[in-house]
Amino acid sequence: NHTTSAGAFLFLVNGTDAPLHYNGTTWTAPTITGITPANIISVISHKKRLWFTLKDSTQAAYLATEAVAGAATTFQFGSLFSKGGYLNALATWTRDGGQGADDYLVAISDRGQVALYQGVDPAEADTWELVGVFDVPRPIGRRCFVRYGADLLLITLEGVFPLSQLLAVDQSQSTRVAITDNISPAFASYARLYSGNFGWETVVYPKGTRLIVNVPVAESERAEQFVMNTISG
């Protein structure tokens, strides 16, 4: 969802078809120039600006502040991903549970490298800064991030991790901070068998105090879930 002074918009993208957005009344195919819109495989709203992940590319693209169409500007992450691969997903990390100056833009490669940026305008060097690049376990799926309070959870081949803790430990010790540590053998087995299937996703269900990890056992046919109580763990 992307909220602007003109209203709230729901964006739909899939990396194959032209994007659509919905304003509560009408579906519209926005005109986006500077890139091939059908290559947009995921979208986030970060600091009042839409950011797009481009399919099988190390580039992202972004629109002007509060824009829902118009000229897109590309942003290259390739030089930061020393292990190669492509940009797998983007996320916005609020860190304080709200929207503020300390929000980070998070970019992760399919090979397991995370780049963090802080700032407002990526076109202005004075207000845009690379915080760092971190090695992490390889992510599973394009929907590998979910907001969890002031943190982000990341689904990887080695488990589900709070990003704040994952970036604070050496990768050799990372499994001990996974929220899936208690079920690590089962999770590892599912990851080994089904990580290539579409549909991996973590869902937070606050009313039921549950966190659910969806595992597509048979793509588009059958899924199983890991469920955690968010209070008792």
Region roles according to the model:
Residues 18-20, 59-61, 114, 160:
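Structural signal for beta-propeller blades
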Residues 1-24:
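Extended assembly-interface regions of large multimeric machines
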Residues 23-47:
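Asp-box/WD-like beta-propeller blade repeats and closely related beta-sheet repeat scaffolds
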Residues 43-100, 110:
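Solenoidal tandem-repeat scaffolds enriched in leucines and small polar residues
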Residues 6, 37-39, 46, 86, ...:
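Beta-rich catalytic cores
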Residues 31-36, 80-83, 133-137:
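Surface loop/turn motifs at the tips and blade-to-blade linkers of beta-strand repeat domains
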Residues 25-29, 68-75, 122-130, 169-171:
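Beta-strand initiation motifs
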Residues 4, 10, 92-233:
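Beta-sheet-dominated scaffold domains
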